[in-house]
């Protein structure tokens, strides 16, 4: 490709494009999480009747995927560009393809395929109809219409577009290793992230204190429940995220059996569902303030 955008130029281009489509530009949420979907800007805002259009970069940590910086495409932490639009625009796939054009990828000159891959996140009680988007044989995006989030049916339906920024940048810059991606002029991805990749992998697989992590999970779970009992949705959800990341560290360390693993996931799911239900109830008390007046009156009148 002739237009070899840097990593940060890819982000800037996507931000400008989705801003032009009416999305608010949010910032990465300051808690560890395994995917951009787990940000409250997606998880919480995808439920309930209020409209929501947002785009943001989300660093996503997956301890079990760490490879000490030795694998060119497998990472402890990668970056997602997350777009959520609710209600889903009827032309969302067309908007997505136009975003690729902004990045210098002409859909007419490349093999772009939507491969069915329905999505599910057992830890949060979430699922949806989905597709992987393949560009010349490489997955670059996950496309999902949420049907359920936090155990609640979504109405209206939220569309989520999740770009894998490292894969996208590798393709645009024509490099085989993520560590060779140019983040900014003269600065390679590896110069920023290779050492953290090694250290986090070593910590996740060899060094982490299992007893401490087990104790932390119990503490975070109790604190989430305590916050929820006071109607404090956002602090409670922060602790759900902490539970999730702590479990992922335990899983990477091999500290939980297959049976225990299912139990931990069920506990996180129970918390996530409680948070989701409480969030909608709290928004209802506020009169669903993001709805227009006519929709609000009609919705509240139904009750």
Swiss-Prot record:
Record EC number: 6.1.1.14
GO BP, one annotated term: glycyl-tRNA aminoacylation
GO MF annotations in UniProt: ATP binding; catalytic activity, acting on a protein; glycine-tRNA ligase activity; transferase activity
Keywords from the named record: Aminoacyl-tRNA synthetase, ATP-binding, Cytoplasm, Ligase, Nucleotide-binding, Protein biosynthesis
A GO-annotated cellular component: cytosol
Major localisation: cytoplasm
Catalysis: reaction(s): tRNA(Gly) + glycine + ATP = glycyl-tRNA(Gly) + AMP + diphosphate
Record flagged with keyword Protein biosynthesis: yes
Pfam families linked: tRNA-synt_2e (PF02091)
Classification via Gene3D superfamilies: Bira Bifunctional Protein, Domain 2, Class II aaRS and biotin synthetases, domain 2
Compartmental location: Cytoplasm
Subunit text: Tetramer of two alpha and two beta subunits.
Similarity comment text for this entry: Belongs to the class-II aminoacyl-tRNA synthetase family.
Protein name according to UniProt: Glycine--tRNA ligase alpha subunit
Source organism (scientific name): Streptococcus equi subsp. zooepidemicus (strain MGCS10565)
UniProt gene name: glyQ
């Amino acid at each position: 490709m002739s237009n070899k955008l840097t990593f940060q130029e890819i982000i800037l281009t996507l931000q400008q494009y989705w801003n032009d489509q009416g999305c608010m530009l949010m910032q990465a949420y300051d808690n560890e999480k395994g995917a951009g979907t787990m940000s409250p800007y997606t998880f919480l805002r995808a439920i309930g009747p209020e409209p929501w259009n947002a785009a943001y970069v989300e660093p996503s940590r997956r301890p079990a995927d760490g490879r000490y910086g030795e694998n060119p495409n497998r990472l402890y932490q990668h970056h997602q560009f997350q777009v959520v639009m609710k209600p889903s625009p009827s032309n969302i796939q067309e908007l997505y393809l136009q975003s690729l054009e902004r990045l210098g990828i002409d859909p007419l000159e490349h093999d772009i395929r939507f491969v069915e891959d329905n999505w599910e996140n057992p830890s949060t009680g979430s699922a949806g109809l989905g597709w992987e988007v393949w560009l010349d044989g490489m997955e670059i995006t996950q496309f999902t219409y949420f049907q359920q989030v936090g155990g609640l049916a979504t109405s209206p339906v939220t569309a989520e577009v999740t770009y894998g920024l490292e894969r996208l940048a590798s393709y645009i810059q024509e490099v085989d290793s993520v560590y060779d991606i140019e983040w900014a002029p003269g600065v390679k991805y590896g110069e920023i992230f290779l050492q953290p990749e090694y250290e986090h992998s070593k910590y996740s697989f060899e060094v982490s204190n299992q007893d401490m992590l087990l104790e932390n999970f119990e503490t975070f779970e109790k604190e989430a429940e305590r916050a929820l009992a006071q109607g404090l949705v956002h602090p409670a959800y922060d602790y759900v995220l902490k539970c999730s990341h702590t479990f992922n560290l335990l899983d990477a360390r091999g500290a939980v059996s297959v049976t225990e693993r299912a139990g931990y996931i069920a506990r996180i799911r129970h918390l996530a569902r409680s948070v989701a239900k409480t969030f909608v109830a709290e928004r209802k008390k506020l009169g669903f303030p993001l709805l227009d007046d006519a929709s609000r009156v009609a919705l509240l009148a139904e009750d």
